[in-house]
C-alpha cells in the first residue's frame, strides 16, 4: 500500500492514505499505531479526506518508523481496534477559524467606529469585506439552509440564513456579522460540551492503558523459566499469558493461571465491592487488581472482551431513537414554518425588518432538537458504568413506564447455581456413582444451570463421565442420549411418563418429598427402565424479596413468576418471595403467551430471564432484560437491556435511570420551549435586538446540553 507524503516541515507531516478514506475504524488504527512511535506528539487521521497529519519532534522521531506504522495499521485485525471515533472528529479547525476571523473583524469594526469616530455605515470597500466575512462565518448555516430547501423541509438553518440575508440587504453588516459570530460560538460550545460528555462516558468505561506485560516461556530452558516483556496492548493475542500487577487494569478476558489477587470489577458489573480471584477464576478486561498479582491466559482481546462489547453496544445504542425524540423533531419541523409566518406578520404590521430578524433568530428550535439525544447519550453511558447495558433510547424510555414484570425463576429470582443434594439408585444393578456419571454424560453439552450442577458434582467426586454418541434436547423436559449402545432419558417425571417409562411407587414418593422441599428431581431411565434419581436445589437470591417489595413500591402493579419446575416447587419459592401470581411447568411458548396476555390487558411489560428458553418472551416484552452477561448469548442478544452482573438491585436502577432520563428530557423541552415562547413575545414587542436574540438562543442550547450532562454521573456513587 503506497503512501504519499504531501508535506513535511517544521515537525508537521501530512500523508495521503487512500485506504483511510471513509473508514473511521482504520483511521483509529492509524492513530493508535502512530501515537506509539517515539517523538510523536499528536496524530489525527481524517476519514473524510483520506489524510493523516502527524505533529512530531524532528530530533526524536524517526520519519521512516512513522510511515511504517501507518502502513502497518492497514493490517491490524478489526477486533483489536479500539471502539472510539478518530481524534480528528473532535477537531474542527474551520469552526475555530470562523470564530477567530469573525471576532477579529468585529474588533476592527469596533476600533473604526469608536477609536477613529467613523460613521456606522460602511463604505463600499468596508461593506464588501464585511459581507465576505459574514458569508464565510455563516457558511455552515447557508449550506444547511440550501440542503433543507432542496429536501423540501425548512430547518433551523433556514431561519438563521433568512435573517442573515435580510441584514445584508439592509446593509446591516455589523449586525449580521455579530449574530453569526455569536451563533458560531454557541455551536462550538455545544460541540465542546457534547464531546466532553462522550469523553466522560469513554473514560468511565475504558482505561487509558496502552501496554501490557506478557509472560513468555522458553521450552528449551524448562517449564519454570519465563520472561516478562512489555508489549503494545493491541498486539496481545488469544492464548497469551498476561501478567497483571497491583493497581493495573486487566487488559483481556480470560482465566487466572497463576497467582491470586483482590480485584475491583466495578467497570464491568457496577459492583464496588472487590472480589478475590485465584487460579481457575475467570476475569474480565477493565477489572483492576487492587492487591496481589495474577497471570491471566487471554480468552478474548480487544473489542471481543466484555468491556469491548459494552463500549460497542453503547456507541450503537446512542443511534437508537426514543419515541420522545420524535416528539421533539416533529415540534422542530412544524415550528420552523410557523416562525417564518410569525416573522412575516410582524414585518407586515410593524414594518420593522430588525424586529422580524430578531423573531427569526429567537424562534430557532435548536435547543428542542438537542433535548433528547443529549440526555439519552448521557443516560446510556451512566447505565454502562453501573453494569447496565441499555441497547437504545427507546428501551430507556420504556424502562421508566413498566408496570408489570414477568420473571423466569431459575437464574433470576434464584441464584442459578443449583447443587446436587441426593443421588438415589432405583435399580439393583446400578450404584449412585453410575447414576450420576450417566446423568452427566447426558448433560455434558448443556448450559442449563441444572446440567452444570450435575457436571460439577461429578468433578467434585472425581467420577469419570462416559462419552456419548449422540444427544437430543427435549426442550422443557430433559435430554435423550445414546451412549454405550444404550438409550438414556434424563429429565422430569413427565418426560418418563411421555416415553412410557414406568415410574415406581418409591420413585414417586421421593419426587413428592423433594418437591415439598423445593428441590428439583431428575429421573434417569436406561433402555426404558428407571435406574436412578438425582435431586438439586437452587437457593433463592438473598436480595430477591427486598427488590420485589421495592418494585411494588415503585409502581409495578403485577409481578408474575414463570418456571418449568413442578407446581409444588414453584409454590414454595413463590411463598418465600411473597409472589401471588405464578405459573409452573411452562414451555418457552407459554412464557411468550404470559407476556402477551399482560400486554393485552394494557400493561407495559418487562421480562427478566437468562436462558435460551426465555428468548421469545424477552423479544416480545416491551422491555426484555437479560440477567448477567454470563447468561446465554441468545438471551443477551435478544434482550433490550443486559445486566453485567446478577444483582437484582440493578433492576431498580434500570427503572430509576429510565424515569430520570425522561424527567431530564421533559425539563429540556420545557426550558427550550419556554425560552422560544418568551423570546417571541419580547421580540414582537420590540424589546429584543438581533444580537440579544442570538445570545439567548445560544444560552438555551448550552443549558440543555449541560442539564443532560448531569445524567452521566447520576447516582453513580450510591
UniProtKB/Swiss-Prot annotation:
SUPFAM superfamilies: Calcium ATPase, transduction domain A (SSF81653), Calcium ATPase, transmembrane domain M (SSF81665), HAD-like (SSF56784). GO terms for cellular component: membrane; plasma membrane. Pfam families: E1-E2_ATPase (PF00122), Hydrolase (PF00702). The gene is ctpC. This is Manganese-exporting P-type ATPase. Its EC number is 7.2.2.22. GO terms for biological process: copper ion homeostasis. Keywords: ATP-binding, Cell membrane, Magnesium, Manganese, Membrane, Metal-binding, Nucleotide-binding, Translocase, Transmembrane, Transmembrane helix, Virulence. It catalyses: Mn(2+)(in) + ATP + H2O = Mn(2+)(out) + ADP + phosphate + H(+). The keyword Glycoprotein does not apply. Mg(2+) binds at residues 408, 410, 610. It comes from Mycobacterium tuberculosis (strain ATCC 25618 / H37Rv). Disruption phenotype: Deletion of the gene leads to cytoplasmic Mn(2+) accumulation and a decrease in secreted Mn(2+)-bound proteins. Mutant is hypersensitive to zinc and oxidative stress. It exhibits an impaired growth in human macrophages. The chain crosses the membrane at residues 87-105, 128-146, 154-168, 177-191, 327-351, 357-375, 661-680, 690-709. It is a multi-pass membrane protein. It comes from the Bacteria. Residues 11-78 form the HMA domain. The keyword Transport does not apply.
Amino acid at each position: 500500500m503506497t503512501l504519499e507524503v504531501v508535506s513535511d516541515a517544521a515537525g508537521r507531516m501530512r500523508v495521503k492514505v487512500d485506504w483511510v478514506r471513509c473508514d473511521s475504524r482504520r483511521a483509529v488504527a492509524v492513530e493508535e499505531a502512530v501515537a506509539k512511535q517515539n517523538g510523536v506528539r499528536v496524530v489525527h487521521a481524517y476519514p473524510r479526506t483520506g489524510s493523516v497529519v502527524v505533529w512530531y519532534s524532528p530530533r526524536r522521531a524517526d520519519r521512516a518508523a512513522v510511515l511504517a506504522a501507518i502502513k502497518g495499521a492497514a493490517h491490524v485485525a478489526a477486533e483489536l481496534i479500539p471502539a472510539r471515533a478518530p481524534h480528528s472528529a473532535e477537531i474542527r479547525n474551520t469552526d475555530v477559524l470562523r470564530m477567530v476571523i469573525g471576532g477579529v473583524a468585529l474588533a476592527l469594526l469596533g476600533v473604526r467606529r469608536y477609536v477613529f469616530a467613523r460613521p456606522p455605515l460602511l463604505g463600499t470597500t468596508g461593506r464588501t469585506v464585511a459581507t465576505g466575512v459574514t458569508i464565510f462565518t455563516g457558511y455552515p448555516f447557508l449550506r444547511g439552509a440550501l440542503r433543507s430547501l432542496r429536501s423540501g423541509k425548512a430547518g433551523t438553518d433556514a431561519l438563521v440564513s433568512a435573517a442573515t440575508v435580510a441584514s445584508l440587504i439592509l446593509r446591516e453588516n455589523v449586525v449580521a456579522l455579530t449574530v453569526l459570530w455569536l451563533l458560531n460560538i454557541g455551536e462550538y460550545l455545544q460541540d465542546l460540551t457534547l464531546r466532553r460528555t462522550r469523553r466522560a462516558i469513554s473514560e468511565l468505561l475504558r482505561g487509558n492503558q496502552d501496554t501490557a506485560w506478557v509472560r513468555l516461556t522458553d521450552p528449551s530452558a524448562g517449564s519454570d523459566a519465563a520472561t516478562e516483556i512489555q508489549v503494545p496492548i493491541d498486539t496481545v493475542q488469544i492464548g497469551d499469558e498476561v501478567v497483571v500487577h497491583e493497581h493495573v487494569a486487566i487488559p483481556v478476558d480470560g482465566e487466572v493461571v497463576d497467582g491470586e489477587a483482590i480485584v475491583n470489577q466495578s467497570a464491568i458489573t457496577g459492583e464496588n465491592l472487590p472480589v478475590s480471584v485465584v487460579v481457575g477464576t475467570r476475569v474480565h478486561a477493565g477489572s483492576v487488581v487492587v492487591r496481589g498479582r495474577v497471570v491471566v491466559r487471554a480468552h478474548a482481546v480487544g473489542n471481543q472482551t466484555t468491556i469491548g462489547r459494552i463500549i460497542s453496544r453503547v456507541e450503537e445504542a446512542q443511534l437508537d431513537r426514543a419515541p420522545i425524540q420524535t416528539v421533539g423533531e416533529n415540534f422542530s419541523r412544524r415550528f420552523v414554518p410557523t416562525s417564518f409566518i410569525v416573522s412575516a406578520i410582524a414585518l407586515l404590521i410593524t414594518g420593522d425588518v430588525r424586529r422580524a430578524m430578531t423573531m427569526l433568530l429567537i424562534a430557532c428550535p435548536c435547543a428542542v432538537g438537542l433535548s433528547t439525544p443529549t440526555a439519552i447519550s448521557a443516560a446510556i453511558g451512566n447505565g454502562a458504568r453501573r453494569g447496565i447495558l441499555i441497547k437504545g433510547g427507546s428501551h430507556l424510555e420504556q424502562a421508566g413506564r413498566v408496570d408489570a414484570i414477568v420473571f423466569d425463576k431459575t437464574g433470576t429470582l434464584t441464584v442459578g447455581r443449583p447443587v446436587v443434594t441426593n443421588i438415589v439408585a432405583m435399580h439393583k444393578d446400578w450404584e449412585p456413582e453410575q447414576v450420576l456419571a450417566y446423568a452427566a454424560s447426558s448433560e455434558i453439552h448443556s448450559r442449563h444451570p441444572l446440567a452444570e450442577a450435575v457436571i460439577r458434582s461429578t468433578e467434585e467426586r472425581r467420577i469419570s463421565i462416559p462419552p456419548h454418541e449422540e444427544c437430543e434436547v427435549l426442550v422443557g423436559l430433559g435430554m435423550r442420549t445414546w451412549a454405550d449402545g444404550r438409550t438414556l432419558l434424563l429429565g422430569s417425571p413427565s418426560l418418563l411418563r411421555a416415553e412410557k417409562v414406568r415410574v415406581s411407587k418409591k420413585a414417586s414418593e421421593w419426587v413428592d418429598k423433594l418437591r415439598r422441599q423445593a428441590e428439583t428431581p431428575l429421573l434417569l431411565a436406561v433402555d426404558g427402565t428407571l435406574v436412578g434419581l438425582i435431586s438439586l436445589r437452587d437457593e433463592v437470591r438473598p436480595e430477591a424479596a427486598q427488590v420485589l417489595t421495592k418494585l411494588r413500591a415503585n409502581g409495578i402493579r403485577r409481578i408474575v413468576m414463570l418456571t418449568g419446575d413442578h407446581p409444588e416447587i414453584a409454590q414454595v419459592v413463590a411463598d418465600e418471595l411473597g409472589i401471588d401470581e405464578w405459573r409452573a411447568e411452562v414451555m418457552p411458548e407459554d412464557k411468550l403467551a404470559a407476556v402477551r396476555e399482560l400486554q393485552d390487558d394494557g400493561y407495559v411489560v418487562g421480562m427478566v430471564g437468562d436462558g435460551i428458553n426465555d428468548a421469545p418472551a424477552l423479544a416480545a416484552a416491551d422491555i426484555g432484560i437479560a440477567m448477567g452477561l454470563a447468561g446465554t448469548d441468545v438471551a443477551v442478544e435478544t434482550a433490550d437491556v443486559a445486566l453485567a452482573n446478577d444483582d437484582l438491585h440493578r433492576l431498580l436502577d434500570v427503572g430509576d435511570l429510565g424515569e430520570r432520563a425522561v424527567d431530564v428530557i421533559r425539563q429540556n423541552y420545557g426550558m427550550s420551549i419556554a425560552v422560544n415562547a418568551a423570546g417571541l413575545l419580547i421580540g414582537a414587542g420590540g424589546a429584543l435586538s438581533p444580537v440579544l436574540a442570538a445570545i439567548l438562543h445560544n444560552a438555551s442550547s448550552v443549558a440543555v446540553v449541560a442539564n443532560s450532562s448531569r445524567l452521566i454521573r447520576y447516582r453513580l456513587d450510591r
